[in-house]
Structures are given as structure tokens and as C-alpha cells.
Amino acid sequence: MSPMPRVAVLGASSSPVVGIEYERHPEWSALAALPAYDIVLLDLPAVRAGEALRSLRMDKRYRFSLIYCCQEQDASCKALSDGAPPADLSALVPLWRLWQERFALFNRGVAPERFESRVLAWLWLHPHGAIHAVRDAGVAQHYHYPLLEALEDDESPNAFAWLQLMTQQGWLEEGELVDRVRLCVGCGSGRLNYVDVCPECQTLEIARQPSLHCFTCGHVGAQEHFLKDGLLLCPNCFSRLRHIGSDYDRPLENYRCRSCQAFFVDAEVEARCLDCGQAHAPDKLRVREVRHFRLAEAGRLRC
């Protein structure tokens, strides 16, 4: 075991890093041609730190390394880093030695080859770490797990199905519930558009239409059907409607379908998938809970 860790600081900040010896580099790409460092400190804004973290975690040399974010962190930083460094940077030395001891215990110090072993190893080596769900508008299901993506190599497991399987086997346990999303039954996408349609013919061609309710006979119809020679007359019982509240009233919203001419009070709601085009009733959509996950006791024993 090396007596002292080699530390790299990424970022062009001129602010000094006190308490530990280090080498500063402006970009993470500068590390590619150099021997691997033991600890990396990212002195970068959150967005750039997140990009650097994704690249570092996909590099097998830095997959399990201690990497800290010195500036403000976003969700990707929290998912892939060891958080903020200790205020006294000299405390990094015992943390690194503990990391070395744990790595030597896992699989006798040999880097794990299988995807599930890599994930368990990462969680084992980062005791306060978790598999964080991160919201991403570019993902069809609205959330993804950056840590799993960084560790997958040539494997491409379905993250949600894999997490459910690992939880059922007892290696992982559910953490905080982050969100609940609704997905298309056909393709599993969460890119859904909720539209009001005619309950008779399911067309979008509907419009609000003023209507009247005759108190004499109870007839409800479009206001235009009650107008005759400038007077309000019920088209059903021919009563003259003079006073709103005593002769007639205006119901809440009514709609007219421009395709089939149906007249109705409540439109039907459809969830239309923007990816595959299928339409479903909202209560038929798949509901998925989005959670963070952490290493379970059985997972620790497996390590």
C-alpha cells in the first residue's frame, strides 16, 4: 500500500487547495495520458463536474475511485461522486486507506467483471453511496440511473427491471421514493399527451358551447336552439324563458362534437403516447414508482 495517495484537482480555479499535496489539471481529459490518481477533486461548476464524473466513472481506472465535488452539486454529481470533500483535506488520507482496505477485501482485490458485481462493489466501496434516480427530460421514462449507465460496459440491462430483480434477491433495498410516473402500455414511454375527446366518437374536434336548462320540462340544449325571433323559447315545451334562476339556468360547461354532433357535459380524457401513437384511458396506464436504492445487508455479505 502506498503511504500517501496521489491527488488530482480538476479545474482552472486559482483558489488554493490546502491540507494535501496535489496536481492540478484544467480538464478531465488531461488524466487520460497520465498514470491513475488515487483521489480526484473536481473544482468545477455542477454541469461540468457531472460531465467529468460520467467520463471518469466509465474509465475502468477511475470506476471505483474516490472522487469529490468541491463546488455546488447537481443530481448527477450526487449520483456519481463521493459528495463534498472533508473541510480538512488531510482527512482524505485515512478515507483513502479505508477504501484500499475495503477494495482488498472485495473479490481479493480483483476488479469485478460482471455488471451486478461492479454495482455491488461500487456501493461496498462507497458506504454512503446509493443508486440515485435522476430526472432527465431526454429519457422516455423521465428518469435514469447514471451509476448503472456508467458501470454497464457492453451490457445494457433494463435498469428498472434489474433493480427490481436485485431487490427481490435481497442484495439491494428500496430507498427514498422520488416520483411516480405513468407509462404507455404499448411501448413503456412516459411521453404522454392528455387530450379531451368526444365520448361518442373519440375525436379531438370538440368545443365548448353555451347551453340552457328549462325548468318547466327539464330540457337541456344548446343556447342557439332556444333563440327564436329574439326571444328565449324552450324547443321542447315551447315555454317562454324570461328570468334566469326561475325559468331557466345555465348548466356548467357543455360541449358539442363537431364530427358527430354529440352534446355532452364531460369530455373523455385519453393519454396519447408521443412515441408509438397508441391511446389509452388514464386508468389503464402502467404506474411505476421511481426510487433511490442502497446496498442491503445480504448485498454486503455477498461482497
How should these model regions be labeled?
Residues 5-6, 49, 72-92, 96-98, ...:
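Regulatory and interdomain segments flanking nucleotide-handling catalytic cores
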Residues 1-58, 87-91:
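A short, well-structured beta->alpha microelement
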Residues 168-295:
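Cys/His-rich short segments
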